[in-house]
């Protein structure tokens, strides 16, 4: 299954707003997104993957919004 690698800025904004709406605390979800992005950036740096088209913060927003929208993704882990 091939994933889409390009997302419009409107879609990223919509997903970020959905995350904020589903969260009880705006600050906490912002920190969670930042921590996920920081963790991703560290993993990418250690693996030396320069060809990834998405920035870590955008990838974190997409992943976290997918987890909220599709909780069955977490059930497999």
Curated annotation (Swiss-Prot):
<dbReference type="GO" id="GO:0000428">
    <property type="term" value="C:DNA-directed RNA polymerase complex"/>
</dbReference>
<comment type="subunit">
    <text>In cyanobacteria the RNAP catalytic core is composed of 2 alpha, 1 beta, 1 beta', 1 gamma and 1 omega subunit. When a sigma factor is associated with the core the holoenzyme is formed, which can initiate transcription.</text>
</comment>
<dbReference type="Pfam" id="PF01192">
    <property type="entry name" value="RNA_pol_Rpb6"/>
</dbReference>
<keyword id="KW-0804">Transcription</keyword>
<dbReference type="GO" id="GO:0003677">
    <property type="term" value="F:DNA binding"/>
</dbReference>
<dbReference type="InterPro" id="IPR006110">
    <property type="entry name" value="Pol_omega/Rpo6/RPB6"/>
</dbReference>
<comment type="function">
    <text>Promotes RNA polymerase assembly. Latches the N- and C-terminal regions of the beta' subunit thereby facilitating its interaction with the beta and alpha subunits.</text>
</comment>
<keyword id="KW-0240">DNA-directed RNA polymerase</keyword>
<dbReference type="InterPro" id="IPR036161">
    <property type="entry name" value="RPB6/omega-like_sf"/>
</dbReference>
<keyword id="KW-0548">Nucleotidyltransferase</keyword>
<dbReference type="GO" id="GO:0003899">
    <property type="term" value="F:DNA-directed RNA polymerase activity"/>
</dbReference>
<protein>
    <recommendedName>
        <fullName>DNA-directed RNA polymerase subunit omega</fullName>
        <ecNumber>2.7.7.6</ecNumber>
    </recommendedName>
</protein>
<comment type="similarity">
    <text>Belongs to the RNA polymerase subunit omega family.</text>
</comment>
<dbReference type="InterPro" id="IPR003716">
    <property type="entry name" value="DNA-dir_RNA_pol_omega"/>
</dbReference>
<dbReference type="GO" id="GO:0006351">
    <property type="term" value="P:DNA-templated transcription"/>
</dbReference>
<keyword id="KW-0808">Transferase</keyword>
């Amino acid at each position: 299954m091939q994933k889409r690698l390009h997302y419009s800025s409107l879609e990223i904004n919509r997903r970020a707003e959905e995350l904020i709406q589903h969260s009880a605390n705006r600050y906490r979800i912002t920190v969670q997104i930042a921590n996920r992005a920081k963790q991703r950036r560290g993993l990418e740096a250690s693996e030396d993957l320069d060809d990834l088209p998405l920035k870590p913060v955008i990838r974190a927003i997409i992943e976290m919004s997918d987890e909220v929208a599709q909780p069955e993704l977490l059930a497999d882990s």
